[in-house]
Amino acid sequence: MAARLCCQLDPARDVLCLRPVGAEPCRRPVSGSLRTLPSSLPSAVPADHGAHLSLRGLPVCAFSSAGPCALRFTSARCMETTVNAPRNLPTVLHKRTLGLSAMSTTKIETYFKDCVFKDWEELGEEIRFKVFVLGGCRHKLVCAPAPCNFFTSA
């Protein structure tokens, strides 16, 4: 049986918080396999996760102890950003960045939840990183932008 998750958007940190339904309330991302949930999950992706990999194209906040500006969770084999996201998500997130009226936080949470359930439950995707960038990173890139497969090679 697939895991059911509670999906909450923390607008203060631009972080999508996922936790198993019925688990202790916490506002940190969940990591690990969600097909077979262990009894004790790590509360977040470690700050040094992937630190041995190339930083090409990653923002300077990528390995910050506070976490990167990207929304991370384990799931699909592709990286979804404001550039290649379906529907009107790029426009919505751009408006939010500018402080203009856009899709409500509840609707954004629903959008991400639908993506998570589709990938994990319907498609049975392998456990990989999927990234949703909410309004773009506030930090400069380490070097010139380049195709980044860091999150897709986990």
Curated annotation (Swiss-Prot):
InterPro entries with a match to the protein in the record: Transactivation_prot_X (IPR000236)
Compartments where found: Host cytoplasm; Host nucleus; Host mitochondrion
GO cellular component: host cell mitochondrion; host cell nucleus
Similarity comment: Belongs to the orthohepadnavirus protein X family.
Transcription regulation found in the keyword field: yes
One Pfam family of this chain: X
Location of the region described as Mitochondrial targeting sequence in the Swiss-Prot/TrEMBL record: 68-117
Organism: Gorilla hepatitis B virus (isolate Cameroon/gor97)
Assembly and binders: May form homodimer. May interact with host CEBPA, CFLAR, CREB1, DDB1, E4F1, HBXIP, HSPD1/HSP60, NFKBIA, POLR2E and SMAD4. Interacts with host SMC5-SMC6 complex and induces its degradation. Interacts with host TRPC4AP; leading to prevent ubiquitination of TRPC4AP. Interacts with host PLSCR1; this interaction promotes ubiquitination and degradation of HBx and impairs HBx-mediated cell proliferation.
Biological process according to GO: DNA-templated transcription; symbiont-mediated activation of host NF-kappaB cascade; symbiont-mediated arrest of host cell cycle during G2/M transition; viral genome replication
Gene expressing this chain: X
Keywords per UniProt: Activation of host NF-kappa-B by virus, Activator, Apoptosis, Host cytoplasm, Host G2/M cell cycle arrest by virus, Host mitochondrion, Host nucleus, Host-virus interaction, Modulation of host cell cycle by virus, Transcription, Transcription regulation
Protein name: Protein X
